[in-house]
């Protein structure tokens, strides 16, 4: 079979895996309330808002997912070199990373909540721990497995010269950064502050004054994940999937058109710059259109 067709198929599969991983990563952070929005959850009891959110800001998402995917990639790489099937090796590595993820989540939830119990009266809800840890580990496993699979495809079928553990680390940091900057806005700026008028941002005076009641009953992290699965999660997946797909596409295009290595590299760089320029132009057009259409925010 034509090597170009194999590369295109591997790129399509890697892009699809990256899309799933981005969505799962964002929804996992919504269930556990990690990254930027967690500062508001942490401030809640200090503002008198006793809540039932799962409070587990282990670290920023880029650092934590860099760790999880690097663990999975390293174990998978070792098992593949030992002769195990690649898919099984990735599953085993992702399973170990899920255990690490769960251990950090439990310790972070208990530690951060107990630290606020005596002074601010925030209880440690054990049912919140037991009901949330499953979705956290489950979403995390899906995210880590698909990211490790995309990294494996990059190192085998797409010609990435770096070893699997290093590519997995880079992919983990990347998806964590995208989830923190893209999907978490839907959770932190909207879901946590639905009692305030939409579009007003989060003034300093409102920080920590989060919603503690849901449409029915008391709100928790599972409610946040359900809400964000309709926009924030898919948007994060689309963003990460496009990054992986377009980055691989420019390299394949350079290999098809170019002759020597310098020409291939130059074409790939030019296509990459063109993609960035087009994306920036579309973003600018959308922002200007939205501002002209809806005008400035008014309370």
Curated annotation (Swiss-Prot):
GO molecular function, one term: tetrahydromethanopterin S-methyltransferase activity
Keywords of this entry: Cell membrane, Membrane, Methanogenesis, Methyltransferase, One-carbon metabolism, Transferase, Translocase, Transmembrane, Transmembrane helix
GO cellular component: cytoplasm; plasma membrane; vesicle membrane
Pathway: One-carbon metabolism; methanogenesis from CO(2); methyl-coenzyme M from 5,10-methylene-5,6,7,8-tetrahydromethanopterin: step 2/2
Spans through the membrane: 57-79, 95-115, 133-153, 158-178, 237-257, 262-282
Membrane topology, as annotated: Multi-pass membrane protein
Family per record: Belongs to the MtrE family.
Quaternary organization: The complex is composed of 8 subunits; MtrA, MtrB, MtrC, MtrD, MtrE, MtrF, MtrG and MtrH.
Protein name: Tetrahydromethanopterin S-methyltransferase subunit E
Lineage of the organism: Archaea, Methanobacteriati, Methanobacteriota, Methanomada group, Methanococci
């Amino acid at each position: 079979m034509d090597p170009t067709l194999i590369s295109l198929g591997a790129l399509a599969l890697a892009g699809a895996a990256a899309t799933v991983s981005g969505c799962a990563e964002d929804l996992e952070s919504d269930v556990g309330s990690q990254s930027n929005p967690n500062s508001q959850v942490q401030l809640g009891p200090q503002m008198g808002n006793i809540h039932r959110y799962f409070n587990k800001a282990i670290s920023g998402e880029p650092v934590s997912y860099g760790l999880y995917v690097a663990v999975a990639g390293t174990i998978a790489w070792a098992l593949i070199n030992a002769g195990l099937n690649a898919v099984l090796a990735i599953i085993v590595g992702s399973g170990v990373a899920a255990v690490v993820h769960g251990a950090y989540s439990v310790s972070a939830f208990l530690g951060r909540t107990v630290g606020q119990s005596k002074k601010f009266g925030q209880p440690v809800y054990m049912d919140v721990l037991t009901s949330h840890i499953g979705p956290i580990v489950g979403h995390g496993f899906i995210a880590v497995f698909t990211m490790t699979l995309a990294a494996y495809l990059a190192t085998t079928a797409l010609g990435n010269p770096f070893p699997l553990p290093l590519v997995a680390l880079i992919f983990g940091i990347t998806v964590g950064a995208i989830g923190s900057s893209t999907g978490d806005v839907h959770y932190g700026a909207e879901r946590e502050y639905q009692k305030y008028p939409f579009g007003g941002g989060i003034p300093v005076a409102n920080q920590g004054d989060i919603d503690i009641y849901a449409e029915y009953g008391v709100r928790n992290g599972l409610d946040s994940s359900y809400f964000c699965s309709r926009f924030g999660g898919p948007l994060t997946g689309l963003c990460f999937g496009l990054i992986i797909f377009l980055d691989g596409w420019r390299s394949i295009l350079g290999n098809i058109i170019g002759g020597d290595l310098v020409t291939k590299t130059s074409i790939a760089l030019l296509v990459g710059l063109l993609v960035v320029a087009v994306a920036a132009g579309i973003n600018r057009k959308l922002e200007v259109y939205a501002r002209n259409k809806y005008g400035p925010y008014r309370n």
